[in-house]
Amino acid sequence: MEGTTPGTPQAYEDYEETVSYEDAVTRVGYDESAVERWAVEPDKRPGRTAFQRDRARVLHSSALRRLAGKTQVVTPGTRSRAWDASPRTRLTHSLECAQVGRELGAALGCDPDLVEAACLSHDLGHPPFGHNGEQALNEFAEDCGGFEGNAQSLRLLARIEPKRFVRSEGSGELVSVGLNLTRAALDAATKYPWPRRAHPTDPTSPKFGVYEDDRPVFDWIRKGAPGHRTCFEAQVMDWADDVAYSVHDVEDGLHAGHIDPNCLHAEPERQAVFAVAIGRYVPADTDPAELAEALDRLLDQEWWPHGYDGSAVAQARLKDATSQLIGRFCLAAEGATRAAYGSGRLTRYAAELVVPRAARLECAVLKAVADWYVMQRAEQERLRADQRVVVAELAEALTARAPEGLDPQFWALFDEAADDRARKRVIVDQIASLTDVAARSLHARLTGHL
């Protein structure tokens, strides 16, 4: 359970006891710093690489399991036969992202276990009710550093998820270091390597990857990293995420009957989709004609589903279309990246993932299709409004009554918090950890809204 003081570099000799330098590092293109851990710990079993251990730790984490109860596109149990029978959740999305990322990463020379660990980790910090809950929590947390799902993922991996504890040099008390993943794994899971309001090109961007009180581990992760660049494995994870959710959200929309593929030939429908794409998924100055060309390229494919009736044959054709799309997007990135960097192993900061503009536009159009036909339905907006109320009222109730209502883990952290700002962050951590059902249940118990 215990290790050494956080931030102490792990001597490679400790790691070398179980895996040779040649096998663990040189063979896969990673140096000693990549396999260092925030806190030194002994290896348990010979024959496992550091990144295999990272992947296993994320796979067995309670944070990953909780994603089964968190919204992906539509909340499970909303009277859609398709979603009620087999709803896609944050967990299934993460597993699909991991499969896509692992294969693309391996094709480009990354360690596949490292990329898979990053893909499994990328949504761990998302709160109940998806981006809707994220917005409500960010409003509540405005005066204690805000809330961002990616920053929360890092906080979970490095502090909250109970796996490893070390003795503090100052007080001698046990301090959590989370899953104590390698530097490379934490870096690969860091999609936005900058703090709040420090976006390298857009200071107004709400995206960031670290809270101020998590800066010590973040600075350790980024030691030697060039500026705000994301590592190559994080770029692979990011594209795998885009590919997985753009393709599968459309698949779910077709399966549930919310998307009629024939509508995509009608000009008013197309313009509505392009407006969503320009508003959310592509630069604002993108020419709609480019989006029209991207959509037409997809519609012209022989495997594109031009109808869907739910029959076994239709389901098989739809599944083939999803496979074709995933392959199309991954091969485009693989081919363009290889053309730019050659056939060697591409790892860490040795390269940038090259995704052709055509592939990015096609992916963006798919996101916009799912957004327009699924997420922007009137009943979904009513549901989202109710979800925002649940999160806001739950935050107020916990603020007034904490530590009552907190899980034992967060109760202890609340008692140890130094000031109101720190106590508020604990409440945010508690709410972010809840599943959709658990959030509603706790809200009902604390507010009496049964």
UniProtKB/Swiss-Prot annotation:
Q: Which UniProt keywords apply?
A: Hydrolase
Q: Does the keyword Hydrolase apply?
A: yes
Q: Which domain of life is it from?
A: Bacteria
Domain (HD): residue spans on this chain: 90-246
User: In Gene Ontology terms, what is a biological process of this protein?
Assistant: dGTP catabolic process
Q: Which cysteines are joined by disulfide bonds?
A: none
| SUPFAM superfamilies named among the record's database cross-references | HD-domain/PDEase-like
Question: Which InterPro entries does this one have?
Answer: dGTPase, dGTPase-like, dNTPase_2, HD/PDEase_dom, HD_domain, PHydrolase_assoc_dom
According to the UniProt entry, its GO molecular function terms are: dGTPase activity
Q: Which family does it belong to?
A: Belongs to the dGTPase family. Type 2 subfamily.
Question: What is this protein's name?
Answer: Deoxyguanosinetriphosphate triphosphohydrolase-like protein
Species source reads Streptomyces avermitilis (strain ATCC 31267 / DSM 46492 / JCM 5070 / NBRC 14893 / NCIMB 12804 / NRRL 8165 / MA-4680)
The organism's lineage is: Bacteria, Bacillati, Actinomycetota, Actinomycetes, Kitasatosporales
What is this protein's gene name? dgt
